[in-house]
Amino acid sequence: MDIAIQHPWFKRALGPFYPNRLFDQVFGEGMFDYDLFPFLSSTVSPYYRHSLFRGFMDSGISEVRSDRDRFTINLDVKHFSPDDLTVKILDDFVEIHGKHSERQDDHGYISREFHRRYRLPSNLDQSSISCSLSADGILTFSGPKMMSGLDSSHSERPIPVSREEKPTSAPSS
């Protein structure tokens, strides 16, 4: 069973009539006129309008999948290196924290920080959890589930983030 935190099609209640990138996870990449004035850009040039349904990985939305035998979290962290990321398990939650110091980009100087926390299934085998960062900046946290009669230990422990050389393909919905 796939569990999506927020499906891209139902991103905002007002759909294309609401500035849709203001609070997304694409900090520091600049804003366009259609981000602030969606009515103006669509009426002046309807053929130049920004796509209403951007790809999943371009939107900064995390994806949580929990099926019968595996639990997986995919998170777009393309602006962070493995050294900037901290992943740890604390009781029934996994906490993912990313922070990098101020650096220069195309628009000036920027520093980024985020903190995400996800509840883990009670039957997740915490001793077999892996966490990797793909070449295209997708952090994948995953682990197998145990038989329902067993219970995993709940304590605080860090999870190392390994670096993969190949990009992650976008997950299918």
From Swiss-Prot:
InterPro entries cross-referenced by the UniProt entry: A-crystallin/Hsp20_dom, Alpha-crystallin/HSP_16, Alpha-crystallin/sHSP_animal, Alpha-crystallin_N, HSP20-like_chaperone
Record protein name field:
Alpha-crystallin A chain
UniProt: Zn(2+) 1 binding residues: 100, 102
KW Zinc (keyword) present = yes
Q: How does it assemble?
A: Heteropolymer composed of three CRYAA and one CRYAB subunits. Inter-subunit bridging via zinc ions enhances stability, which is crucial as there is no protein turn over in the lens. Can also form homodimers and homotetramers (dimers of dimers) which serve as the building blocks of homooligomers. Within homooligomers, the zinc-binding motif is created from residues of 3 different molecules. His-100 and Glu-102 from one molecule are ligands of the zinc ion, and His-107 and His-154 residues from additional molecules complete the site with tetrahedral coordination geometry.
Q: Which GO terms describe its cellular component?
A: cytoplasm; nucleus
The places in or outside the cell where this protein is found are: Cytoplasm; Nucleus
Q: Where does Zn(2+) 2 bind?
A: 107
Pfam families per the record? Crystallin, HSP20
Which ranges of the sequence are coiled-coil? none
Give start and end of each sHSP domain. Answer: 52-162
